[in-house]
Amino acid sequence: MGEKEIVDGCVAACHIAYACSEVAFTYPITPSSTISEVADSWMSRGRRNIFDQVVSVVEMQSEMGSAGALHGSLSVGCSTTTFTASQGLLLMIPNMYKIAGELWPCVFHVTARAIATSSLSIFGDHNDIMAARQTGWAFLGAMTVQEVMDLALVSHVSTFECSVPFVNFFDGFRTSHELQKIDMISYETIKKIFPYEKLKEFRERALNPTHPTLRGTATSSDVYFQLAEARNKYYESTPDIVQSVMDRLAKLIGRSYHLFDYYGHPDAEFLIVVMGSGGLTIEEMIDYLMEKSNEKVGMIKVRLFRPWSIDAFVKKIPKTTKRITVLERCKESGSLGEPLCLDVSTSIMRSELSSNNILVLGGRYGLASKEFTPGMALAVWENMISENPINNFSVGIDDDVTFKSLFVRQPRLDLLTSETKQCLFWGLGSDGTVSANKNAIKIIGESTDLQVQGYFAYDAKKAGGATMSHLRFGPKPIKSAYLLQRCDYVAVHHPSYVHKFDVLENIKQGGCFVLNCPWSTLEELNHELPSKIKHQIASRDVKFYVIDAQRIAQESNLGRRINNILMVVFFSLTNIIPLDLAIKLVKEAIKKTYGKKGDAVVNSNWKAVDLTLESLIQISYDKSQWISKDKCGEKSLPATAVETGNKDQEITKSTVLKQKPEHDVNQFVKDILGPVNALKGDELPVSMFEPTGTVPLGTTAYEKRGIAMSIPIVDMNKCTQCNYCSIVCPHAAIRPFLLDEAEFKNAPETMHIPKAKGGQEFSSYYYRIQVTPLDCTGCELCVHACPDDALHMEGLQKMEAVEKTHWDYLIGLPNKAEKFDRTTVKGSQFQQPLLEFSAACEGCGETPYVKLLTQLFGERMVIANATGCSSIWGASYPSVPYTKNQKGYGPAWGNSLFEDNAEYGLGMVVGYRQRRDRFRELVSNEILKDITEEEEFLKDDNASVQGRNEIITKYDHLKDYLRSWLKNIRNGEACQSLFEEISKLLEDNLINSNNFAQVLKKDRIELLEKLYDSRDLIPKISHWIVGGDGWAYDIGYAGLDHVLSFGEDVNIIILDTEVYSNTGGQASKSTPFGAIAKFAQSGNLRQKKDIGSIAMEYGSVYVASVALGANYSQTIKSLLEAEKYPGTSLIVAYSTCIEHGYTKYNLQQESVKLAVESGYWPLYRYNPELVRTEVVDNLTTIVSSGFTLDSKKVKVDIENFLKRENRFLQLIRSNPELASMAKDKLKAHSDKRFQKMKDMSENVTVTALKDQIKKLKDQLISIQNASKTGELAASGLINADLFIEQEMHVLYGTETGNSEEVAQYIQSQLVSRGYSSSSLNLDDLDIDEFLNPDKFSTVIIVTSTSGQGEFPGSSGILYEALLKKHLENQDDKFCSFMRFGIFGLGDSNYVFFNEAAKKWDKLLLDCGAVRIGAVGMGDDQSEEKYETELIEWLPDYLQLINAPEPKHDEKSEIPKATTFKVTILDSCRNDILNESTGTLCEKLDENNNIGNSHYKPIIPPNSVLLPVIENKRITNQDYDKDVRHIVFKLIGDGGDTPSLSYCLGDSLALYGQNPVNEAIKAIEMFGYNPYSLLRLSINEENEANNTNKVNQRYSSLFGYDITVLQLFVECLDLWGKPNRKFFQEFYRYCSNPEEKIQAKKWAQNEGKKLIEEFSSKTGTYLDVFKMFESARPTLAQLLDIVPFIKSRSYSIASCNKFVNGEKIELCVGIVDWKLESGEIRYGQCTGFLNRLPILDSESKIDSIPRLPSNIKASAFNLPFDYRSPVIMACMGTGIAPFRAFVQNKKYIRDVLKEEIGPVILYFGCRYYDNDYLYREELENYVKEGVITSLNIAFSRDPKGYKTSNCENIRYAQKMYVQHLMLENSQEIYENMIEKCGYFYLCGTKQVPIDIRKAIIQIIIKHSSTTEQVTSEEDANSILNSIQIMGRYNVEAWS
């Protein structure tokens, strides 16, 4: 007998395989991976085999590779083995035929596993074995862990003795992963039986040139057959040889085996034949039946399945046998029976038993490790003895479709005695429970004489799923190969499980129950525990204990690892071994398990062990009270079909396969998801399942696992709305939400929802970041990604209720994604993630990429997903995280295999393209074929059809859509939009009505029906092939390489975790040098495959390397470019993984950044479309390589990255010398690669050529500039000292990529002017490099601002270094050599507007640098965002540095290709001015009818038409300022529903119109007919177009017919002020050469003066065209250079509640001025308002004006407390919002009956008599006590002109508001500072500056001495803090 050890089946097999082999070729596949890992571990530790040699364990790229390499190794005489399962075995079949054909001795160790069919399963059955049974290999099967070892040795010996290769197989998981105490076979014993002589013979057959032979010939039909038959004798002799080996082994080890072993009654009448672990359960059942009633039942265990020995089998059958049942763990569809059953039947038929009339029955059990319990075994026997037994039955399921399943009478039959203790542990995936229980088994088994068994069940979730550890201990051998039926001890390690699972279902009477939870008192437990649990505890006299293991783990610095704590609890309560000894052994196990992770981890675990017992609490419960608890009020699982359905339904109906299965998600959740997640899936009947395995999307949203201990909680006061938390969230569990006014008002009161920040598109929304508490995993990534510390973690139980209420409300709101640019970091996160709540590990690095893909392209994605982590978290039945959007669109997902995913995805692309090509032919050749006469497609009797013209128009629109589709067939966004339009049009007129059928001929209708049926081919599918590095670098690489070479339009993303994550962390060819992984446990000593460089070699593949955690914008940019690229694209995505072993897992983003900054993971993009070449002297040189290195500098030493991850630290601890060498090699490799990429990025291959050209240019430019500088200096325009060198670099700091884009644009402008320029990330420079005067004497800095005045992620390091140097050398102006310009990107809604740019400016000036020009202040609140300022700032800067003019060529002289296409139609429409309304209308014909095309006003996106019911002047008629009070009626389509809702401080954005008569003149000037109809569309001929960038204002016109007059009146801003960008393009349109020369001057540096002079005269776009008569662009060209009319926003002067939501009131000043010519001109919008009729309540007109309008949200923050003081200051029409504020206060006081605080108003006017607006109303509010203090400053009235009789009303003359505030400073200070009031200001741009100065003076004056506010700086700091809190609010206008 050998030594006893506790091992699982994998280790048992490995022990023999390692001993008897010289080489093992491996590839990881579950569940065989453990064998490979153990062998690799032994190899790394130097363990030797029986040949006294360390086995060479070689990991291959696939199972195909392993089999091929193994075949080669055998061919040269090397004893070789491998380990595999399932698909892996199938991949080896071709080589298995070859090996068997050549009679090579060999053993495959196979952990038998299910084969993927309609779904994948990693669990055990015999389908893979049966699929390979025909290959000519011998198959030897084991039932127990002991048998695995013994029969493995039989296999290895037999294969040499009979020259037939063997498969040694055993059940996957049930045997492979079951822990048992077994007798090990020593190497000495193995050597005694090993056939060394046969080994010698084998080696003599090896291929060797000293005795050469040849194998593997190609044969013809004349000899092939004979060769096949020549091997017969080997197979005929094999059974006897195997039996001989078994007999010899028995003498050595004392355990006897036979080809077939019998067990049972010697005179059995009923016999069961079985193979594998199921036989153990049959044994228990036989013992039970024989003991109970001496039943004559027996069993034959099949050992040698192939070659099958009839004689050996028949000899084991008792002569008394009447019936035989063959149990099979496989299914062979379409066969008469499964393979074993056929073998048994054939054996009986061919033997002497054929005349005995033995009935042979076949049945299936245990597929994919389905449980096979004693109760099921009993059901098999009961079926066999029944009068009418079922043949081809199934057992263990409920087959209510074909009704072949057996009824299990005793499902909980437990055949174990009380001697065997059974313990069940419910753990949370990755919490360490399983590993702790493995240690516990080993401790018990090694320190006692008890037999042990351990089996561990998991769900398919990567982490956070349920784990069930089934442990048995007893004095006798444990045969029970099934889960626990009755438990002595139950431990539940996560408190949520008591609500989810029936955890005490199997607990015995008097059992022990341990619950890990934060509830420690009986009161808490009474409240928290479900009634059912309490009833079970009391009714079974359960001893109940609780412990808060999470608290202990946190105190011990263990995070969430509670395993060892609860193991100590187990030992303390079970008394299996003395407690002191147990704790000692536990600590030793901890040292052994965690030693590689360092002493700190070990010590933390030891501390937790020591704290455990004092924290264990036994609960004394009131048994009578608890036992009376019933299940009332409990959440129960929904009834399943087996409980409610009818089993007598006709089979034919249930077996019909639908072509397009429709899934009711709710029904699926009810019938399948709920029961499966409650671990009741075994009870589901067959009828519940869709035959093809198709499942509905979005089922994870129903799970609500609640596994996080703590969740992120947002402080919206700190949140800067960057959305970073959302983009990093692996589970889409935290998201940004936008709410409109109505949604905001209906939101839960507990939810803080501030105004949305950003550009104008956000202006009408509120914003909230929200977590879904029950879907969050608590990884904390969002907390660490937040730049503003706006997130912190709180306990789930504390926050669940309120946060769930918030989430439920927000998730039910309409998604507003369509209104935002999904191509930005922020905008992408407003898109619904179509991957949510997956079962990936907490902090998973893969899911954020796929989630982001779904946000960018999800509604049109098709995904081919390789097997691996991404297929498991992405599609583990029935949990599907992929979901659909509100329109029902979402990713379509498929999985084939591990190895063929690239080919699978390619097939999708080719197949879809083929179908789409046919569809395109249908559209172009049939539906749109040229038809000149309407009669050819119209019915003869169509004239009388009502609405005929309208129907024909719709049909014409359909054809227009289809034409547009043909032109945009490769444009994803356009096709998606057209798909929706076409589908709707067809549904409205073909499917849901007979409109088209009334008018169109039958053949047309049939074509349209075909079109509708195939409409899903309209979208341009975004094809994505998704997989991990194991697939891409190894097993699937050949296929991947083929797809890369193929050139199809398909996108590939490799989620590169650098190990085989799914199978447990084995090394792949992606594993980095020096990392420790399984199969590389001594450190991986080969460099990682550079798959990106390999792909780039094709020259036709788009390639990008990305790391989301390091650079969000680069990742998004890469994904967008890849998807747009018209060919194959490859994204290599750095994906963090728990296998990396982060020292602090929640800080993994920092590790990602270090990976990039150290050069370990470079970020780059290669776009073949950007490759440019030039031919110089017949030599083709690369001008642009198409390669962009986005991580432009190595910033930190690679060691900083390596030391954060345990995969590298393990090597440092175990072998410091090797680790040091590995680090040096990895660094050298990374540096070399970085330099190569830098060279590629800079095109150094043509450096010499460029240098020569540059020198010549420089000489010429220097001559030119010397002249120009002199001229400019002489003229005084520029100081000669400021002349700039011809090298100028643009440095940027960016967070989202916008600053980088601006920098690149500026760089391109510099390059076009002859400068040598580059754009560099600020932090890519170190300080010494930055202070190099030879390179950076002139720079432009472009930077955004992050958070509350912080630097963006890529610019803080250099700034801090420069600041430090300055502080150390304040008198040293070390930057005096530098000239700089600076441009900031910011949002004026933020307090620290452009703060980063201001800080850079101040620091550089302090260091002696000289700024050129002003600081550019880009503002997201401007109409064109930062571009508004940029197009003014950059030309000014270029003029100041005397930059040369851009180089001009022929292309620069002609107009560019237009963005739009304008089609002038043949028909016209007579639009005219409606004198009553001042707007356009359609003229009726002589019969008062309108034509076919109706006039409809153009309504900009997100706008509505509001009727004007009042427009009256409220200033004196003789006063020069015309101020209007304008009222809009809020009546929607419903008659009395407001069509717009607004709140305090909001503005109404109005779209003005141009004067009709002037527009007609302008149209005629451009040569068009004002009344011609036109149609606007994208110009498909302009390939540079990107429809994603097309403004909604333009795209909203697509598909509509408008007149040229309507375009000029309602769209083109021809009467607006031209910007600099216009002049830069305008000269191209001048056909007269002289005019072109003159116009070009306006585009050059000197043009600024011309433009300023022109603007001073308020020139318009139209004026420019009048000046240059030859410039007559087409309408399409006009659309490119003349913008659309912009909205003008006016503060709303009414309170919505005060006016009952019935109207909007404005106070608008009409803007007008007189030109030198005497012409009166008006502001664009106010001029339009001025042209409207004067209206009041008495006005009587036929129709009223309706104006396009929308709401723009206010930046004002309103107080939550009505009693907070409110101080308001305004000038002129700035009174508007404050009038609304005062109305609101009156409403609160008079209607809501709430107390209000002080209301103080400071109002600046010119004259009391002329412009004291709303005087009577305001002073009445004072008298009513609403306004506390009214203060009016009249700047033009003489002093003393008017006085007030009311003490609360103050008049002051000859002063401005700020002066009046200073006079009343005490009032201001008391209410604003002391009482924490809110201050509001509304006025022109200069006013906020003056007011702020006044308040600062007030703070200084009234602050107490203890506050030490003695300077403006201190006071300003106080005011800044008030502003950050939202209590200082400014709205200013120019």
Curated annotation (Swiss-Prot):
Ranges for domain 4Fe-4S ferredoxin-type come to 710-739, 767-796
Tell me how the cofactor is bound: Binds 1 FAD per subunit. Binds 1 FMN per subunit.
The keyword Transcription regulation is annotated on this UniProt entry? no
Q: What class of enzyme is it?
A: oxidoreductase
**Amino acids binding [4Fe-4S] cluster 2:** C776, C779, C782, C786
Catalytic reaction annotation:
pyruvate + NADP(+) + CoA = acetyl-CoA + CO2 + NADPH
One cellular-component annotation, GO: mitochondrion
Q: Which InterPro entries match?
A: 4Fe4S_Fe-S-bd, 4Fe4S_Fe_S_CS, CysJ-like_FAD-binding, FAD-bd_FR_type, Flavdoxin-like, Flavodoxin/NO_synth, Flavoprot_Pyr_Nucl_cyt_Rdtase, Flavoprotein-like_sf
Which SUPFAM superfamilies does the entry mention? 4Fe-4S ferredoxins, Ferredoxin reductase-like, C-terminal NADP-linked domain, Flavoproteins, Pyruvate-ferredoxin oxidoreductase, PFOR, domain III, Riboflavin synthase domain-like, Thiamin diphosphate-binding fold (THDP-binding), TK C-terminal domain-like
Q: Which domain of life is it from?
A: Eukaryota
Looking up Gene3D superfamilies in the UniProt record yields:
3.30.70.20, 3.40.50.360, 3.40.50.920, 3.40.50.970, NADPH-cytochrome p450 Reductase, Chain A, domain 3, Nucleotide-binding domain of ferredoxin-NADP reductase (FNR) module, Pyruvate-ferredoxin oxidoreductase, PFOR, domain III, Pyruvate-flavodoxin oxidoreductase, EKR domain
Listed under subunit, the entry gives: Homodimer.
Q: What additional remark is attached to this entry?
A: Arose from gene fusion of pyruvate:ferredoxin oxidoreductase and cytochrome-P450 reductase. Gene fusion has only been found in Euglena and Cryptosporidium.
Q: What is this protein called?
A: Pyruvate dehydrogenase [NADP(+)]
This chain is encoded by the gene named PFOR
